[in-house]
Every structure is written in structure tokens, then in C-alpha cells.
């Protein structure tokens, strides 16, 4: 299913795609390691003036009985500030009838992956799943929680107006190979009760050639 950006993309913990070097090592039949050196600003942006790159490592382990796990860490040096670090942990389950996933993400010393700021941290988790139905239908649901830390001398988190939770659910229909339609409902519930919560009902189409 393709109904929304990943947690990392949605909350700008990392770029959806980037330019650089990635090498994969098969350590054994169950464990794979990736080592990468990337531009750090995403493929749409040029290298920063200081020439700093994003470097990191990830481990993917294939657990028994349809379970899998992934640990990820990267670091991006910044001028006149501590390095931006981004880490995540994923646990998933996949079977013929559906999928489940749970991930936790943490971004340190940054407002987002391109904007360094000492002591500004964000973290959150995402739970999602899908269930296949007869006649090429599929149900899906997702819940996110995103938060930021409280800085010294402040009473609220530094990103309080954008902290909160996202609930999304809907159904998807695969008309033929490469053609999918889905309808979904999204509700973002702000931690700041003064801000009106945002809800959207949308219909999407996906075409792959």
C-alpha cells in the first residue's frame, strides 16, 4: 500500500531519497548490513557549503515465522553545532493475509534533517498494518505519535504546535497489475488544544508502468 509518506519522510527526520554511496554486506543467511555515505540534503538539494555528508549504518535481521527487524543510525556533521543524529528501530511481521509494523524514530540536535540546532530533539513511533480481503481489496490502518523535547526555561515543548498524533485508515483496491485506488481518512490530533485538529478524506490513484 502507498497511502502516505513513511514516518521519517512525513516528519522530516530524513530525505525520501538521496545521492551517495551505499554498500550492502550479507553477514550470514539472516543478517544484512548496509553502510552508506550520502549528500545529506536529499537528491533535490546541492551539497552544503561545508561539504559535510551523512554517514551511517543499518542492520536488517530476518527473524523466524515471518518476523523481521531493522536497526538504523546516521550522523551528519554541522557547522558550529553538534552533529545531527537520526536513529530508528523497526519490527515487522508479514504473512500471506497481511502485514504489521512498529517503528520508533529519534532525531537529535535538529529541527529537521537539514536544520541543525543543539539540544532540539524529536522522537516518535508509528504502528501500521494491512489485511488482504477477497476480490483484490485491502484494509489498512496507521497510528503515529510525534513529540519534541522541552528546552530549559520553557513550559512547553519547542515544537508544541506541531506535536501530536495521526490516525489514518481506509481501503485499497487493485484494479489490475500496476493500478491501485484507495480511499482513506486522516485525523491529526494536536497536543496544543488551541489548534483545531485536521481531518481529511481523500481518494488516491496509483499507476505503475
Q: Where are the language model's segments positioned?
A:
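Outer-membrane beta-barrel pore domains
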Residues: 61-209
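Surface-exposed coil loops of outer-membrane beta-barrel proteins
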Residues: 4-61, 203-206
Amino acid at each position: 500500500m502507498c497511502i502516505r509518506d513513511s514516518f521519517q519522510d512525513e516528519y522530516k527526520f530524513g530525505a525520501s531519497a538521496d545521492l551517495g554511496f551505499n554498500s550492502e554486506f550479507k553477514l550470514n543467511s539472516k543478517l544484512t548490513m548496509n553502510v552508506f555515505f550520502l549528500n545529506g540534503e536529499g537528491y533535490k538539494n546541492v551539497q552544503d557549503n561545508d561539504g559535510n555528508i551523512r554517514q551511517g549504518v543499518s542492520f536488517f535481521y530476518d527473524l523466524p515465522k515471518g518476523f523481521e527487524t531493522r536497526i538504523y543510525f546516521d550522523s551528519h556533521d554541522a557547522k558550529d553545532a553538534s552533529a545531527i543524529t537520526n536513529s530508528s528501530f523497526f519490527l515487522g511481521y508479514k504473512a500471506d493475509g497481511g502485514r504489521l509494523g512498529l517503528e520508533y524514530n529519534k532525531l537529535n540536535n535538529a529541527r529537521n534533517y537539514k536544520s541543525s540546532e543543539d539540544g532540539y530533539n524529536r522522537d516518535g513511533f508509528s504502528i501500521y498494518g494491512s489485511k488482504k480481503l477477497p476480490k483484490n481489496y485491502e484494509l489498512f490502518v496507521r497510528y503515529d505519535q510525534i513529540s519534541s523535547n522541552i528546552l530549559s526555561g520553557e513550559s512547553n515543548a519547542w515544537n508544541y504546535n506541531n506535536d501530536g498524533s495521526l490516525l489514518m485508515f481506509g481501503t485499497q483496491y487493485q484494479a489490475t497489475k500496476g493500478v491501485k485506488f484507495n480511499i482513506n481518512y486522516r485525523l491529526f490530533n494536536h497536543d496544543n488544544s488551541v489548534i483545531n485538529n485536521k481531518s481529511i478524506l481523500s481518494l488516491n490513484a496509483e499507476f505503475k508502468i
